[in-house]
Amino acid sequence: MARVKKGVTARKRHKKVLKLAKGFRGARSKLFRPANQFVMKALRHAYVGRKLRKRDFRRLWITRINAATRINGLSYSKFISGLKLSGIEMNRKVLSEMAIHDKEGFAQLVETAKQKLNA
């Protein structure tokens, strides 16, 4: 049986890592070991970042909705409570977009929520 050496496989793996390390500075993009370490770290950061992005956007949407509801004379929590009571199921992303681009429609939603809270 022939002896199998890992030259081709290692070269492929090294090239793959160095390709991912493109744009890193210094040895982190030129040498395999530092590149491999920082690519692994970068991938971990990217994974965490994808989770954080969801939280950040939800926080942004809530902040926008809160600002718009306060302009219309209601707090965010009361607005959401009123929407739930009136059976309107819109997610925060859509509500945020409405608050920015369709102020009249959003004002109607706030009025609906107010009526349900007072009823």
From Swiss-Prot:
- In the UniProt record, which is one GO cellular component term? ribosome
Q: Does the keyword Zinc apply?
A: no
Q: Which GO terms describe its biological process?
A: ribosomal large subunit assembly; translation
Task: Give UniProt keywords alphabetically.
Answer: Ribonucleoprotein, Ribosomal protein, RNA-binding, rRNA-binding
Classification via CDD domains: Ribosomal_L20
- GO molecular function terms attached to this record: rRNA binding; structural constituent of ribosome
Q: Which SUPFAM superfamilies would you find in this protein's record?
A: Ribosomal protein L20
Cysteine disulfide partners in this protein: none
Q: What InterPro entries does the record point to?
A: Ribosomal_bL20 (IPR005813), RIBOSOMAL_L20_CS (IPR049946), Ribosomal_protein_bL20_C (IPR035566)
Q: What protein family is recorded?
A: Belongs to the bacterial ribosomal protein bL20 family.
Function, as annotated: Binds directly to 23S ribosomal RNA and is necessary for the in vitro assembly process of the 50S ribosomal subunit. It is not involved in the protein synthesizing functions of that subunit.
Name of the protein in question: Large ribosomal subunit protein bL20
Q: What is the lineage of its organism?
A: Bacteria, Bacillati, Bacillota, Clostridia, Peptostreptococcales
